[in-house]
């Protein structure tokens, strides 16, 4: 497999989006990359595929900007590029929640690392003895490809449906530790901040999402694959395309 696929995001205030769009678009085309970069006032969201050299070059270029110096892309390999073209797009949000009061660039919710989460799930509680609730913030068609064992999901069709569903179920999480998760971390970060704001007592986001969990600890306590928004459709715990091997 010769194609490297990366995804990463950063919540950070961007006031020069037009200039960034032109610059990143030109660099990606020059490097022969395919994929999508989203730019919004709240930050950047990146999905790219290309040769190892091209990916290394664009990541180095992004990190040269102090705003993106701590970007930590999640990597996987494939035989072919899962994208057909290169696009840099300007958006109102890098992930649409329609909750303007939620401003992740002003501060993150607490995060739990993959190894720590695995330990909690192994022992059936967090380190303080609280029950752990895995809360899937993804859309219903993504959940159908796979999810954590016994995870709660709201059967939503789009992420903007998450806040009202959460509001109705807020009291279900009293006395429990809630871990929000998604594909790569962006939605669970927004979701965790929103949960804190409406008074859910103990909330963590899964650092780096499902893909980082797969990368660091494999598929423990997870069933099926992880839906991805490209031609691969879903990847397994080994981060390889599942094709027809998805089991729900």
UniProtKB/Swiss-Prot annotation:
Alphabetical keyword list: Oxidoreductase, tRNA processing
InterPro entries for the chain: Rhodanese-like_dom, Rhodanese-like_dom_sf, TrhO, TRHO_N
Record GO terms (molecular function): oxidoreductase activity, acting on paired donors, with incorporation or reduction of molecular oxygen
Family recorded in the similarity comment: Belongs to the TrhO family.
Domain Rhodanese: 128-222
EC number, UniProt record: 1.14.-.-
Keyword hit for Oxidoreductase: yes
A biological process term (GO) from this entry: tRNA modification
Function: Catalyzes oxygen-dependent 5-hydroxyuridine (ho5U) modification at position 34 in tRNAs.
Catalytic activity: uridine(34) in tRNA + AH2 + O2 = 5-hydroxyuridine(34) in tRNA + A + H2O
Organism: Thiobacillus denitrificans (strain ATCC 25259 / T1)
SUPFAM superfamilies: Rhodanese/Cell cycle control phosphatase (SSF52821)
Protein's name according to its UniProt entry: tRNA uridine(34) hydroxylase
């Amino acid at each position: 497999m010769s194609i490297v696929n990366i995804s990463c995001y950063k919540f950070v205030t961007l006031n020069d989006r037009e200039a960034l769009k032109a610059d990143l678009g030109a660099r990606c085309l020059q490097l022969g990359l395919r994929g999508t970069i989203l730019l919004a006032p709240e930050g950047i969201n990146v999905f790219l595929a290309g040769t190892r050299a091209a990916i290394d070059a664009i990541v180095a270029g992004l990190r040269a900007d102090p705003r993106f110096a701590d970007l930590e892309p999640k990597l996987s390999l494939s035989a072919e590029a899962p994208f057909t073209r290169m696009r840099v797009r300007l958006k109102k949000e890098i992930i649409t929640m329609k909750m303007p009061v939620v401003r992740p660039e002003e501060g993150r919710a607490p995060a739990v690392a993959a190894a720590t989460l695995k330990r909690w799930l192994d022992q059936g509680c967090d380190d303080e003895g609280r029950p752990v609730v895995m809360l899937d913030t993804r859309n219903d068609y993504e959940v159908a490809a796979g999810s954590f064992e016994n995870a709660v999901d709201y059967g939503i069709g789009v992420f903007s449906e998450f806040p009202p569903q959460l509001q109705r179920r807020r009291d279900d999480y009293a006395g429990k530790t809630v871990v929000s998760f998604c594909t790569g971390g962006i939605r669970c970060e927004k979701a965790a901040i929103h949960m804190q704001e409406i008074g859910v007592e103990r909330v963590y986001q899964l650092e780096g999402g499902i893909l980082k969990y797969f990368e660091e600890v494999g598929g423990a306590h997870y069933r099926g694959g992880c839906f991805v928004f490209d031609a691969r459709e879903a990847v397994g715990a080994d981060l390889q395309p599942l094709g027809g091997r998805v089991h729900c």
